[in-house]
């Protein structure tokens, strides 16, 4: 039985005309709650940031309708004229931003960017060398729980116990002993600058490719306040959010034409099908923002604020891994306080400061508990916090942690309530999306 035309017209009008509030109240309400959380909590998770309305608008655009398997000018679908132009803009902006010869902006995430390099340059069972997860590496750098640790043969390097810094001589010793085909520099919880030239020297000495995962510090590189790996690495991977302040996604950069051809084939058709062109458009917008002079000031402020936060924590008797930071993030070692990372994360969240529990070098606690927390300044800097605000944030974190040490998990409610009131006053001074 054919539906009456009037019903079809009504359904069509509702489909194209109803906003989210009218169409799906369950989701609309929960997005509103999440907006309230972001507005009224201080975001200290080092891998998170706050994007512009322009980035949100691009990602929420009608480009979500378009399938575009392949690459600009070489698609497997018709109707790709405009998404070709958008993806080309994203590629050219990425190349200009990082001074790279080639870019692939299609990876859906940093993990898939890393996977694409593995697929492009390694065979299953090949040996590669990466930073141990407990020392600040990443799951995709050889964790046995990750594909990288299941399909390939990972060997790891760590940090020195006395200062928690990379020991490059030790890295070279491991490389000479294991003869990896690929060496990875970069990680998810290492706060110091990395000597990329030394890593390249080590890679060359054993005939290995050097891959730098700059997911965490890409925005600092783009802003000119952190050393660039592009002149030294055979290939560089990154996310496009974190310090780069774009949508959640990944990217691969290189100056080697042979490598980009292999990476392109690995991304599509090797790992992915159709690219997310609405996300690629948002990446292009974020890259355009990062090419503006204001972004350099932002990147410098991120580092200045991180140093202010670390110094404030240290004055509260809180231990910072490696003694400080050169970047946007820091690891807090809570073992001297007798506090776990899990308890600190939960207590700080009740005080409206969001961070994540994190293992510290040579940690004996489980990943579910940990002995530390990881803190970062990108999101707070985006909302306008300066060194004075982050100094106060450090003092407030110290109050919560010291309260936990003195009062225990169940006795810290009064401290959390006091800190929460000050946090709410602080976030009210620096509103977002208002």
UniProtKB/Swiss-Prot annotation:
Main location: cytoplasm
Swiss-Prot/TrEMBL site (Plays an important role in substrate specificity) positions: 241
Catalytic activity: (6R)-5,10-methylene-5,6,7,8-tetrahydrofolate + glycine + H2O = (6S)-5,6,7,8-tetrahydrofolate + L-serine
Cofactor section: pyridoxal 5'-phosphate
Protein name per its UniProtKB record: Serine hydroxymethyltransferase
Protein location: Cytoplasm
Entry binding sites for (6S)-5,6,7,8-tetrahydrofolate: 133, 137-139
Modified residues (N6-(pyridoxal phosphate)lysine): 242
Described function: Catalyzes the reversible interconversion of serine and glycine with tetrahydrofolate (THF) serving as the one-carbon carrier. This reaction serves as the major source of one-carbon groups required for the biosynthesis of purines, thymidylate, methionine, and other important biomolecules. Also exhibits THF-independent aldolase activity toward beta-hydroxyamino acids, producing glycine and aldehydes, via a retro-aldol mechanism.
InterPro entries attached to this UniProt entry: PyrdxlP-dep_Trfase, PyrdxlP-dep_Trfase_major, PyrdxlP-dep_Trfase_small, Ser_HO-MeTrfase, Ser_HO-MeTrfase-like, Ser_HO-MeTrfase_PLP_BS, SHMT-like_dom
E.C. numbers: 2.1.2.1
GO biological process, one term: tetrahydrofolate interconversion
Tagged with keyword Cytoplasm: yes
Family: Belongs to the SHMT family.
Keywords from the UniProt entry: Amino-acid biosynthesis, Cytoplasm, One-carbon metabolism, Pyridoxal phosphate, Transferase
Biological pathway: One-carbon metabolism; tetrahydrofolate interconversion; Amino-acid biosynthesis; glycine biosynthesis; glycine from L-serine: step 1/1
Any one GO molecular-function label of the UniProt entry: glycine hydroxymethyltransferase activity
Subunit annotation: Homodimer.
Gene Ontology CC entries for this record: cytosol
């Amino acid at each position: 039985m054919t539906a009456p035309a009037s019903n079809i017209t009504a359904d069509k009008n509702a489909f194209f005309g109803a906003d989210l509030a009218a169409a799906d109240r369950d989701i609309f309400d929960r997005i509103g709650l999440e907006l309230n959380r972001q507005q009224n909590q201080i975001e200290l998770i080092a891998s998170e940031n706050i994007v512009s309305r322009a980035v949100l608008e691009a990602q929420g655009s009608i480009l979500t309708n378009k399938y575009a398997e392949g690459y600009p000018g070489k698609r497997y679908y018709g109707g790709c004229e405009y998404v070709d132009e958008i993806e080309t803009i994203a590629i050219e902006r990425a190349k200009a931003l990082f001074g790279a010869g080639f870019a692939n902006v299609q990876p859906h995430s940093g993990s898939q960017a890393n996977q694409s390099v593995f697929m492009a340059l390694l065979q299953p069972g090949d040996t590669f060398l990466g930073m141990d997860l407990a020392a600040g590496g990443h799951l995709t750098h050889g964790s046995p729980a990750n594909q990288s640790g299941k399909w390939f043969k990972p060997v790891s390097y760590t940090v020195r116990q006395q200062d928690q810094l990379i020991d490059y001589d030790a890295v070279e010793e491991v490389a000479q002993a294991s003869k990896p085909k690929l060496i990875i520099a970069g990680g998810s919880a290492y706060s110091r600058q990395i000597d990329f030239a030394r890593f390249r020297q080590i890679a060359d000495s054993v005939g290995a490719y050097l891959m730098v995962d700059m997911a965490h510090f890409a925005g600092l590189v783009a802003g000119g306040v952190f050393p660039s790996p592009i002149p030294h690495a055979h290939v560089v991977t990154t996310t496009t959010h974190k310090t780069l302040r774009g949508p959640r996604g990944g990217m691969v950069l290189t100056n080697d034409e042979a490598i980009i051809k292999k990476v392109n084939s690995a991304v599509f058709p090797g790992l992915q099908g159709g690219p997310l062109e609405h996300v690629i458009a948002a990446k292009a917008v974020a890259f355009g923002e990062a090419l503006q002079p204001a972004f350099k000031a932002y990147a410098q402020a991120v580092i200045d604020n991180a140093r202010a936060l670390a110094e404030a924590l240290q004055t509260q008797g809180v231990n910072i891994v490696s003694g400080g930071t050169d970047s946007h993030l820091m690891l807090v070692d809570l073992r001297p306080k007798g506090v776990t990372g899990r308890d600190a994360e939960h207590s700080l969240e009740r005080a409206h400061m969001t961070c994540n529990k994190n293992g510290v070098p040579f940690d004996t606690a489980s990943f579910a508990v940990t002995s530390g927390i990881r803190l970062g300044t990108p999101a707070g800097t985006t909302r306008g916090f300066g060194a004075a605000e982050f100094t106060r944030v450090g003092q407030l974190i110290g109050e919560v942690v010291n309260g936990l040490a003195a009062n225990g998990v169940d006795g810290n409610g009064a401290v959390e309530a006091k800190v929460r009131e000050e946090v709410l006053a602080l976030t009210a001074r620096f509103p977002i999306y208002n």
